[in-house]
């Protein structure tokens, strides 16, 4: 299975492509899509959409995983990130890809084993897990991390999160990937 991971951002969007063969992960590509900070917002969003659409055409992934938006201290920044994320998701959907979403906590838990890991720890583990010769930038590393998260059972986490309302009605919830009462 080929997975395209995305770390969305208005200025810089990271991407990472990997393949899962059984339990083995194989690095394919990573990098960033940059929008011109001097351009108007619609032009910047189009740059992201076009860039992601091109990644889908070039790498032909089976699915995509993307980091969920967090609420920033600055509401304006959160809104801009949400718009960038929307443009990215539309680019992914241009290829009719299934899109899976993960929180930063889920990503860090899957990659480092600790949900409060810092960016350096994520980068270091991405290098180790994918046997990379060089260290990817933080945006590309986060994108590879969200792809790793999906490859390591993220589908199960996403399905369990989708069941949360039904479980809550029965007095149950999912905590740390486990069903608790």
From Swiss-Prot:
Pfam families: RuvC. The active site is at 7, 67, 139. The keyword DNA damage applies. Its EC number is 3.1.21.10. Mg(2+) 1 binds at residues 7, 139. GO terms for cellular component: cytoplasm; Holliday junction resolvase complex. Gene3D superfamilies: Ribonuclease H-like superfamily/Ribonuclease H. Its cofactor is Mg(2+). It is found in: Cytoplasm. Its main location: cytoplasm. Keywords: Cytoplasm, DNA damage, DNA recombination, DNA repair, DNA-binding, Endonuclease, Hydrolase, Magnesium, Metal-binding, Nuclease. InterPro entries: RNaseH-like_sf, RNaseH_sf, X-over_junc_endoDNase_Mg_BS, X-over_junc_endoDNase_RuvC. It is an enzyme of class 3 (hydrolase). Binds 2 Mg(2+) ion per subunit. GO terms for biological process: DNA recombination; DNA repair. GO terms for molecular function: crossover junction DNA endonuclease activity; DNA binding; magnesium ion binding. The keyword Ligase does not apply. Mg(2+) 2 binds at residue 67. Belongs to the RuvC family. The RuvA-RuvB-RuvC complex processes Holliday junction (HJ) DNA during genetic recombination and DNA repair. Endonuclease that resolves HJ intermediates. Cleaves cruciform DNA by making single-stranded nicks across the HJ at symmetrical positions within the homologous arms, yielding a 5'-phosphate and a 3'-hydroxyl group; requires a central core of homology in the junction. The consensus cleavage sequence is 5'-(A/T)TT(C/G)-3'. Cleavage occurs on the 3'-side of the TT dinucleotide at the point of strand exchange. Homodimer which binds Holliday junction (HJ) DNA. The HJ becomes 2-fold symmetrical on binding to RuvC with unstacked arms; it has a different conformation from HJ DNA in complex with RuvA. In the full resolvosome a probable DNA-RuvA(4)-RuvB(12)-RuvC(2) complex forms which resolves the HJ. This is Crossover junction endodeoxyribonuclease RuvC. The gene is ruvC.
């Amino acid at each position: 299975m080929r997975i395209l991971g995305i770390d969305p951002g208005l200025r810089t969007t990271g991407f990472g492509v990997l393949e899962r063969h059984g339990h083995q992960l194989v690095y394919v590509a990573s990098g960033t899509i940059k929008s011109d900070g001097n351009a108007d917002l619609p032009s910047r969003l189009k740059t992201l959409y076009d860039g992601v659409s091109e990644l889908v055409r070039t790498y032909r992934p089976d699915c995509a995983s993307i980091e969920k938006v967090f609420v920033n201290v600055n509401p304006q920044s959160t809104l801009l990130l949400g718009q960038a994320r929307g443009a990215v998701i539309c680019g992914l959907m241009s290829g009719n890809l299934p899109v899976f979403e993960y929180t930063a906590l889920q990503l860090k838990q899957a990659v480092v084993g600790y949900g409060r890991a810092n960016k350096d720890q994520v980068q270091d583990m991405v290098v180790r897990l994918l046997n990379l010769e060089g260290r990817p930038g933080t945006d590309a590393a986060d994108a590879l991390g969200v792809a790793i998260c999906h490859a390591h059972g993220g589908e199960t986490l996403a399905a369990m999160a989708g069941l949360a309302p039904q479980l809550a009605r029965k007095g149950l919830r999912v905590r740390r990937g486990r069903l608790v009462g």
